[in-house]
Amino acid sequence: DYNMRALALIRFPIEKTVDNEDFCIYPLKFCKLLKEKYNINFDCLSLSKYSSNYSICYDYGADKTYIIEDVKFSGMDTNMTAKILANFISESDINYDIIVSFILSDYGETAHVPSGVASYLNIPFVYAVKQLTDLTEKELFCKYINPSTVVEVRSTYPVVISLHYQFEFPYNIAPSLFDVYNAKNKEIINISSAFFKRDFVESIIPKTQIIDGKINTIIKQSSLPSKKNANIQETIEMLSNLILKRDKL
């Protein structure tokens, strides 16, 4: 048994298909594998709208499931998403040793979010992991897919890993009756922008307006002229045009 803790970064696809429905829970399955094989407990984290789909995290044995949901954070790109997730991880009371994500997103193969999380946390990142070969209290050993080869690497903790869609689970990973029963007494924990420090939130959404849940960046802001000022402006422009015409004559 290792005195370690893992975190699964979960994001369900906007539109579920036969191809991506199972892939999105690969981080869950990986963390359950860690729990069954090494007795490493884990939590789940997502930046998305609340959905009952996330209750599946508890079915797989997660201790806690956090969903960061706030209108201030809606519509964020991958870089800002990674920054928010990383800030939550760094500000939480738990030190995670292994942070697990997945290679695919709604837009195809990407490592932008997990690599961004690793970058903001200033910790190692292993991309496109195909197999977990070994794990000790000090290091993680795995194989990742290069464009033409499979490379075996090792990393110290903490580390962020991104699972390839060809990841090889040693056996079928599924919810246990024990975890499913306990899941009934667990609730998804909603995290709002109030959790984060004010200066961080302001750095994420500088000069923005929120209209119908969408963020609009303010490029320039000025007051509308009054009717009186508008008439004066029109008079000035008219006189200027007359002077220009006179000078041309």
Spans of model-derived segments:
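Electrostatically charged, flexible surface regions
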Residues: L132-L249
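Structural beta-sheet core signal
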Residues: A8, C44-S46, I67, S101, ...
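N-terminal beta-strand-loop-alpha-helix module at the start
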Residues: Y2-L47
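Gly/Ser/Thr-rich loops at beta-strand to alpha-helix junctions
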Residues: K49-Y50, L104-T110
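Short Gly/Thr/Asp-enriched flexible loops that form oxyanion-binding sites at enzyme active sites
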Residues: Y107-F125
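Structural motif
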Residues: R5, D97-I98
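A glycine-rich helix N-cap at a beta->alpha junction
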Residues: S51-F88
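Glycine-rich phosphate-binding loop signature in dinucleotide/nucleotide-binding domains
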Residues: I89-D97
